C-alpha cells in the first residue's frame, strides 16, 4: 500500500517482475472493525496441488477451476485475545465425570447374585474332565449354562416364602373388608335398631302386687 502511494506521489518506476515469483492475486484489501476483507479477481485459478496425479492421455485436460470463495474473513480480536477476562471461557472437565467408569462397582448393570469362588476351591470345569477329542459348540453349550442355572436356583426358596406371606396378608385384608361390609349393611343396622327399641316382656310371676276385689254396696 505504501509502495502505491509513493509511486503516485514520486512517480518511481515499479520494480521489474520476476517470472519465477508468483503473481499477487489480491486486488483489494479493506479492514473494517477488526475484520480483514480480501477481494479476489474472478479470473484467479487455484494452483495445482503438487501431490496430484497427472491426467491420463486419453482424457481431455480439466478446465481451470475458479475459486468458489473470493472472500477470506479473519476473526476479530475478541475471539483471539488471550489472558484472564479477554478470551472466551474455557470449560474444564470435572474429576467426578468419570466416576462410574473408574469405579465399576457402582455401575447399575452389576447383579447382586454373583458367584464368588474361594481361593482353595477347584474350578467348576477342570481341564482334566474335558475329553481329548474336539467337541462341537452344541456339546459345549449345556456345560456353559450350568453356572447360570445354579445362580438363579438359589433365591427360589426365599421368593416362595415372600409369595406365601403376601398371600396371607391378602387373605386377612379380604376377611377384614368382608366383616366391615357386613357390619355396615342396611339389614344389620335395622336389626340393631329394633333390638334397642324393643322393651323386655315382664312375666306374671315377677309382679308382687295382687289386685283384690273391693266390697260392693247394693242400694235396694
Swiss-Prot record:
- Where composition is biased (Polar residues), the residues are 205-220
The main location class comes to cytoplasm
- Which stretches of sequence are listed as region Disordered? 1-24, 41-69, 119-220
Record field: compositional bias (Pro residues) = 47-64
GO molecular function terms here? ubiquitin binding
UniProt keywords, alphabetically: Activator, Autophagy, Cytoplasm, Cytoplasmic vesicle, Nucleus, Phosphoprotein, Transcription, Transcription regulation
**Residue span of motif LIR:** 26-41
Q: Name one GO cellular component term.
A: autophagosome
- Gene Ontology terms describing biological process: autophagosome assembly; negative regulation of protein localization; osteoblast differentiation; positive regulation of DNA-templated transcription; protein localization; tissue homeostasis; ubiquitin-dependent protein catabolic process
Q: Which domain of life is it from?
A: Eukaryota
Give the Low complexity compositional bias ranges.
Answer: 1-12, 152-170
Does the keyword Phosphoprotein belong to this entry? yes
Function description: Dual regulator of transcription and autophagy. Positively regulates autophagy and is required for autophagosome formation and processing. May act as a scaffold protein that recruits MAP1LC3A, GABARAP and GABARAPL2 and brings them to the autophagosome membrane by interacting with VMP1 where, in cooperation with the BECN1-PI3-kinase class III complex, they trigger autophagosome development. Acts as a transcriptional activator of THRA.
Task: Supply the PANTHER family for this chain.
Answer: DIABETES AND OBESITY REGULATED, ISOFORM G (PTHR31671), TUMOR PROTEIN P53-INDUCIBLE NUCLEAR PROTEIN 2 (PTHR31671:SF2)
Instruction: Report the protein name in the record.
Output: Tumor protein p53-inducible nuclear protein 2
Q: Which organism is it from?
A: Homo sapiens
Its gene name is TP53INP2
